[in-house]
Amino acid sequence: MANSCRCAGGLHDRSRYDEVVLDVMLYSARLHETVARQNSAVIVAMARMIAESFDEDGKVLLCGNGGSAADAQHVAAELTIRYRSSVSRPALPAIALSTDTSALTAGANDLGYDNVFARLVEAYGRKNDVLIALSTSGNSASVTKALDMAQRLGLKTIALLGGDGGEMKGKADLELIVPHSGSADRVQECHITVCHVLVDLVERMLGYRC
């Protein structure tokens, strides 16, 4: 392999890499604790909003880009299929807007990528639905426009953000901002944990688990 851009290291520098493991995982754990302590009430409120939507025959729409798109798909699968095998419940309707490549590419080609999620919210969104918008920076134009469309249509909105919240700060009915800037990874780790807690709480609120 070419080494012009490689740092000094080595495959067998175990002590150095042990430090990396500890630094990354312990920082992530501290960040999780901060998010939990600062946002427990809003997380409960988000879960209640979602549970009330399901109780009123609504559904959840989710959108994000890159790793946030993967998180959106992850959560949609846990709602529609199953979160834990020990809990028997009906399917809960959730759609990740990043999964239909034909719609995404048609929208990007015909309307511009910034408008693709908004167009899908316009197509699928109804009054009792909830949009969960994920952006590690809070500055994703496509996610911001989806949030704007959801509000115009009367959907309830949740934003999971990072850093200082970016342009999306203050736009959603409920928001959670992970206080980490400079990289998306630590923010995404907190987002997916929050989403798991949301699914857990929604199942409890709907009476599917104690």
From Swiss-Prot:
Q: How is the cofactor bound?
A: Binds 1 zinc ion per subunit.
List where in the cell it is found: Cytoplasm
Q: What is its EC number?
A: 5.3.1.28
Q: Which residues bind substrate?
A: N65, G66, G67, E78, N109, D110, S135, T136, S137, S140, Q188
Residues binding Zn(2+), per UniProt: H74, E78, Q188, H196
Q: Has UniProt tagged this entry with the keyword tRNA-binding? A: no
Q: Which UniProt keywords apply?
A: Carbohydrate metabolism, Cytoplasm, Isomerase, Metal-binding, Zinc
Q: Which GO terms describe its molecular function?
A: carbohydrate derivative binding; D-sedoheptulose 7-phosphate isomerase activity; zinc ion binding
Pathway stated in the Swiss-Prot or TrEMBL entry: Carbohydrate biosynthesis; D-glycero-D-manno-heptose 7-phosphate biosynthesis; D-glycero-alpha-D-manno-heptose 7-phosphate and D-glycero-beta-D-manno-heptose 7-phosphate from sedoheptulose 7-phosphate: step 1/1
For this chain, the family text in UniProt reads: Belongs to the SIS family. GmhA subfamily.
Miscellaneous note, as given in the UniProt record, is:
The reaction produces a racemic mixture of D-glycero-alpha-D-manno-heptose 7-phosphate and D-glycero-beta-D-manno-heptose 7-phosphate.
**Name used for this protein in its record:** Phosphoheptose isomerase
Give the organism the record lists.
Chlorobium chlorochromatii (strain CaD3)
Query: Which lineage ranks, top first, belong to the organism behind this chain?
Result: Bacteria, Pseudomonadati, Chlorobiota, Chlorobiia, Chlorobiales
- Point out the gene that encodes the protein: gmhA
